[in-house]
Amino acid sequence: IKSYEKAVRHAELTMKNIGLDYIDLYLIHAPWPWTEIGADYTRENIEVWKAMEEFYESGKTRSIGISNFSVKDIDAILENSRINPMVNQIKLHIGHRQQEITSHCTANGILVEGYSPLATGKILSNGEIARIAEKYGKSVAQVSVRYVLQKGALPLPKSVHPDYIRQNIDINFEISEDDISRLDSLK
């Protein structure tokens, strides 16, 4: 959705379809259509953001944000908004830190929400992470989720299995600075 009118229409349709009075978080899912990854939609994103601001001001959402936005994309919104994005949801996991974006978001008061903290399962068999996890008596998944949290982002792991969901919540431990440095060095 890359126009003000479509953004308004789809927000209203979403509210009707889910049957709720408000949504906790409403995002622009990407700065470009998925069929045109990397294309420049700056003007269109600014239009959509204006609709997002209105949606927020109406009380139909508690928070508004962006997803998969680069520093350039974020700055375009910041320079043309009355209300700054509250969240930037980005892919974030051990080996994929996106430090420039996370630092920029933090400096501008934007919460980074890290999706795929388990790298869509790819890091679950990583031996180095497994050794660190064993040291804390935790699973690789728990260390991976905790890592994202300690990097200052809100981890957003996906699971439909009750045991994994409970495990993803059970991250009340601290990874040492040395171990964070080891995890930072992984690719």
Locations of regions flagged by a protein language model:
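Intrinsically disordered low-complexity regions specifically enriched for long asparagine
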Residues: 1-2, 26
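CE4/NodB-like, metal-dependent polysaccharide N-deacetylase domain
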Residues: 7-28, 54-58, 110
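Beta/alpha (TIM)-barrel catalytic core signal, keyed to glycine-rich beta->alpha loops juxtaposed to Asp/Glu
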Residues: 30-187
